[in-house]
Amino acid sequence: METRTERLSQRDDERLWLAVWLGLAVITALALWRLRDFPYHLSWPAALHGMVEVLPTTLWAAVRIWIFWAWSAAVIAGLVLRIDPEIDLADAILGGVGGLWALGYFLGVLLGPLGLFNTATLWSLLALGTVWLWYSPPPIPGATPTTGQKLALLATGLLAVSMLPLQLASPVAPFMDVLAVPSSVQRIVTFGVYLPFDNAAYGVWGPAAQTPGLELFLAMLGLGADLHAGAGALAQSQVMVPICALMIFATWRLGKTLFSDTAGGIATLLLFWTCLFRRAQGVRGTAVDFALIGLGLAFFLDPSHRRTLIALGAMILGTAVASHSLNGGFAMIVASAGVLFWLAENDYRRFIAGVVCLAGTTLIAVPDIAISTAHHLPYFALAASIATGIALIIVASARLPLTSRIGNREALRILNISIIAGFILAVLLRQSQERFSLFHKVSEDLPLLMLFCFAGFAAAIAISWRDDEAPIPYAALAAVALTLGLVGEYIDALAHMPQYQTTSMVMLWDVAIKLWDYWCPYFLVFPAGFAVALAYDRWSGPAVFFVLMTLLIYPWYQISDPVDYDSVEHSITEQWAFNLQTAAEGYWSGHSDRRWTFGVEERPLIDLLEKEIAAGRITTATHILHLTHDTSSWSLVQFPILTGIDDDPIEVDHHPDNLYQMGGRVRGMSELSAAVAARPPYILEQVPPPAVLGETPAGYDQILNSGYIRLYRRDDLAATPARHNFIYSNLVAIAAIIGIMVVMRRRRSADGDPSVV
């Protein structure tokens, strides 16, 4: 009788879910109908037509990059399972996917300056790991997808249906101010060396804009996929979908750590209301760093206190700082607060280990800190900081038990209630003092998300107050993260004082915008997801899901002239329209080719520069003096993104008070005479030259005249083809091959010895 009742209940539940999906199909159709006059045209056929010309290039690059990333992630996940066979399979997979990012940063800093960060090195290490796992396979634990994981998969699918066409239609990442990244990546690929303090080929921005963690990871993908021409641009643009998928699952995992599995899944869907998916299409650290932030915090603070996760989380957090100094630094503050929670649990052993791990994380981030603040350190100092940081994390985490329980729940309960209530009161107090406070701006952009967030915090207080509820020991860390929005207002005011307008302080000028546009919206989704998850788990899951998805899919409110829609709460279908319109027409307006930014007049320049590199005239020491009207990404001939050569712009419309260019190489025409007197090896003109240069600069030969572009080469430059030492450049590969032979030999010996089990 009970079995029959269960079957009937299951059948009723299936029918209810079927009705929900049919209802959402109707809602989606109505949403698409409402968007028929939307300025952004929602059309998959138009997007397909737009990508046809570049599809052979982008699809082949995407396949190669994705295969290398997936294979490498599988090997790392296998190694994690060998170290900790009882770890959750999803955590092992995420550790592999995110761990490759960290590994790219580590290998880049350790091997890049030595000229050993190359395709042979990467594939030989991958082969070594594959062979070792082949002979010593880890146990693969069984796993059934959880509610949160299913919701994260749904979020990934809802994003991919429009972002995948956008990715394949975009050989160059379709977002402004992101092209410094592929320029730095291409420089590593072109010249086969990573120079930490001379890797900003783009030349427009100062050192604070560099993101070595991201740049080295993308270089790893470009080298691993064996891309050459356009490797930097393609490595950036063709990871658009997988890097967003990693961000989504990292969000689920952090939601699970802070609140619950379902809350994490709901949080991934709420990301559609934020600007993160709009900005992540540019694959720059500001947005995609949240993939590392979410994963690093989720692992490091996981309530199971699994030592493997603590170690992985600490290393990933260090890479998060290196992938965006400001947001990664914020994450370190949250992690430090989490360690204080361990102290409140009276677990002094874990507290000390956490402090040591965060010290190791800080050492891992030292190369980025030195680069961003323009404090030159020798190679051995950078390599030692990475190696020492990793060693500290491994040693500290190894001294912990495999797992440990949450202790002193009463103290945690009081701490959670106090912090959450204090945050709510602080926001209200700040709003009473300053009408246009940071959270006022956030609430104007994201009213529903803000409402759900505070409902979630109220629910967290209520649940923490009751003894009969499932514990959420680290819920208040979401409030700690959001409290940075209050502190940031004062830091922003301080950073804009004249005495702090220096190259080393430039990153602090962005504190306010990064907090209200990125950091706070990201951390709003967790308590907001918890509020919805409570209703989902305790009332009717299908009904709550239908209401939530209706709110997310249908465009309830439209801005009449959506020029900049990124930060405003928008629907999933509007997100589709944004992506498909860009896929159909291309992003880079102002350029003759809206996808590559290089048309028939610019392509000969790239071809010629590649020949100059092959001839040995252009090296890592070469700078091209570049005359341009301005350095806007909509008009500048951005040759570094396909060549990696240093660009030194001289602009007609120069603004020396542009603080974001402080520490960069942009100069005005008033400095042209001095620049020419320094006898640069090449001079590129994309605007008519001033009288000081004449028709042809003295001592230079014109080697290109293509439309509006002219390139001059100093007449004493000689061709000196670079010599490569095959054995040296393949030292790591040779060592890996020897390692493979040793593994195979030992395995054969073990197979022939009956005493070996």
Each predicted region: which residue ranges?
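Membrane-interface alpha helices of multi-pass inner-membrane proteins
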Residues: 299, 309-325, 358-365
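Signature aromatic-anchored transmembrane alpha helix within multi-pass, membrane-resident enzymes
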Residues: 358-362, 416-420, 470-476, 531-569, ...
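Membrane-interface helix-loop-helix junctions at transmembrane boundaries of multi-pass membrane enzymes
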Residues: 143-149, 345-352, 400-415, 457-498, ...
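Membrane-helix boundary/interfacial segments in multi-pass membrane proteins
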Residues: 54, 58-59, 114-117, 202, ...
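Membrane-interface transmembrane helices that cradle and orient dolichyl/undecaprenyl
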Residues: 83, 293-310, 320, 340-347, ...
